[in-house]
Amino acid sequence: MKKTCVALILALSLVVSALGIQPSNAKAESNHNPVVLVHGISGASYNFIATKNYLIAQGGDRNDLYAIDFVDKTGNNLNNGPQLARYIDQVLKETGAKKVDIVAHSMGGANTLYYIKYLGGGNKIENVVTLGGANGLVSSTALPGTDLNQKILYTSIYSINDQIVANSLSRLQGARNIQLYGIGHIGLLSNSQVNAYIKEGLNGGGQNTN
């Protein structure tokens, strides 16, 4: 009887293997790029807690959400750009993805554009969403990137009530620019309306006419 049971188990194992059935705890392949969250001056990864919680509640995988902590909290492009480049390379290696998406707040927008423009990030990013981004300190236009088959799509979200970063710095020529009202600079990190636009931007709802 024991030999019969063993034989049945082996037979079932062969059938499962032949059908390509995977164990139930195997990680499903993600249909989305990993998202890198980039904070601004004096910020930190925890600034994006509300953003992460929203994306997870909308069906996002928490394992696809990465938030950098810059060593230099002053927003210096010369320091933060290279650190961001190393961080993104690490995320791509860890996940096996070809590109990442970025959500950047304040000076994080400028750091992101610096990485794209000067540090080889032009073919490693698919979607960029900036929140009150100081984008104009690096570029006033939506940089197309270096992937000839796919431009980087941008969504720039900013508020007329932002007292920290001028709207003129946040606007990107050729991007999808979204001007909101009644939200402060820090409030952009936790506003439900902003979160909805972030989701759209990460799902290819941005624009690049350049």
Segment roles from a protein language model:
Residues 1-5:
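Bacterial Sec-dependent N-terminal signal peptides
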Residues 15-31:
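Sec-dependent signal peptide cleavage junction
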Residues 144-210:
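C-terminal catalytic-base region of ester-bond hydrolases, centering on the histidine
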Residues 44, 73-74, 137, 187:
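Alpha-helix N-cap/loop-to-helix initiation residues
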Residues 33-39, 46, 56-62, 68, ...:
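Serine-dependent carboxylesterase/thioesterase catalytic core
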Residues 24, 28-29, 124, 147, ...:
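Intrinsically disordered, low-complexity
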Residues 50-54:
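Typically the conserved alpha-helix immediately C-terminal to a functionally engaged Cys/Sec
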